[in-house]
Amino acid sequence: MNLPEINTSLFTRLRFILVETSRSGNIGAVARAMKTMGFSDLVLVNPRFPDALTDAEAVALASGAQDILSGARIVGSIAEALEGCNYAAAVSARLREFSPPVTTQRAIAGQLAAGTELHAAVIFGNERFGLPNEIVEQCNVLINIPANPEYSSLNLSQAAQVVAYECRVAALGDGQLASPVGF
């Protein structure tokens, strides 16, 4: 069976940035979410613990995605994390009075997959407070995952999984969604 050609460039053009993550397990779980969807560029901005990438909880929750952890970078500022990117999308459950245009993960995924000139970053805040306004205001868009309005706060790794999945679907296009049988 000949499968149609797919545009895999989004898999190398999309960076996941975690800002001030406080639980190393969430970093490992994000690495796993990224790897299952074909992404590998992970950058941490000032994680709570300096050994967050090698911590036992991170390694355990990465569950086979240790290569993503070992390839990740730790930087001291959002400016450093965004080096090489020309498009940034903040991810937040909290809408702001003043923010960039609000979109969904599905809409932005399609835009990123189609825009081969875009070297984009999706930026996730910490588990307790999310992203500070100063970072959101630097972004081109604010992704608001349309969750249950009565309880819209996803775990960090769950939000990353939703965004990674939508980006994968957009990159693969129609007819490429089936995975091979087996593990």
PLM segments and residue spans:
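Post-transcriptional modification and biogenesis factors for structured RNAs
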Residues: 1-183
